Amino acid sequence: MINVIGVRFRTAGKIYFFSPGQFAVKQGDHVIVETARGVEYGRVVSGPKEVSDDSVVQPLKSVIRIATDEDKRTVEENHQKEKEAFKICQEKIRKHDLDMKLIDAEYTFDNNKVLFYFTADGRIDFRELVKDLAAVFRTRIELRQIGVRDETKIRGGLGICGRPLCCSTYLTEFAAVSIKMAKEQNLSLNPTKISGVCGRLMCCLTNEEETYEVLNSQLPSVGDMVTTSDGLTGVVQSLSVLRCLLYTSDAA
């Protein structure tokens, strides 16, 4: 067994495991850790807890330090720099007449890299853009193409339910969603009713999928002939799956 903490770097972002090392880290603390992208600032969202050795990627990195007030100021300064970097990158995109939509700019905590997230319909040759950006920021530049679901996760917003989007508040990963889920839940197949802000099928269709699968397996299908315990016979016309009710017409 190994002692770990779970750290998240973005709201609703993936959780990564680190060793607390010599520090008495608790949930809610902010820590400085070394990642594949460099030194980063993150929030402890779980642990410390004991997990099996094979459940984490080895070797496990240790916490460098618990974040100080100076570290927090660095994060705020980076956020301000990101706004300026976003504007500059947009200008460079227009200069090179590239068919791409800039979504976000992000500085790593140690300022060793600036990441720009964008969407585009196809592949983009942004080599000259990267050269221009590197000349301006004098640090490593990474342009990362993302999909419409990731774009919506970054931008946030409200769903048709009136609540903040699931993807930008608590979903750490996107699950596969299919039209079959909407059919099993007897939902309207009108695309405007079952599509999210991103234009894809709503992620929340997966929330009750398992429940509907179990209940549907216990109920007859529309059109089936059924006989009740008191001997009445009829043809199933419609179902109320969650209430486990079915509506029939006289078999005659």
Task: Name every feature range the model reports, one short phrase each.
Residues 247-252:
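Conserved small/polar residues in nucleotide/adenosyl-binding loops
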Residues 157-228, 234-237:
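Conserved glycine-centered short motifs in functionally critical loops
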Residues 1-188:
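Acidic-enriched and Gly/Ser
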Residues 41-46, 233-239:
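Short beta-strand-centered aromatic/proline hotspots
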Residues 3-5, 243-246:
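Short aromatic-glycine-enriched beta-strand elements
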Residues 48-51, 239-243:
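Short, conserved beta-turn/loop elements at beta-strand boundaries and strand-helix junctions
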Residues 29-34, 223-229:
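Short conserved beta-strand and strand-loop elements enriched in small hydrophobics
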Residues 10, 136, 229, 239-240:
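A short, compositionally biased micro-patch
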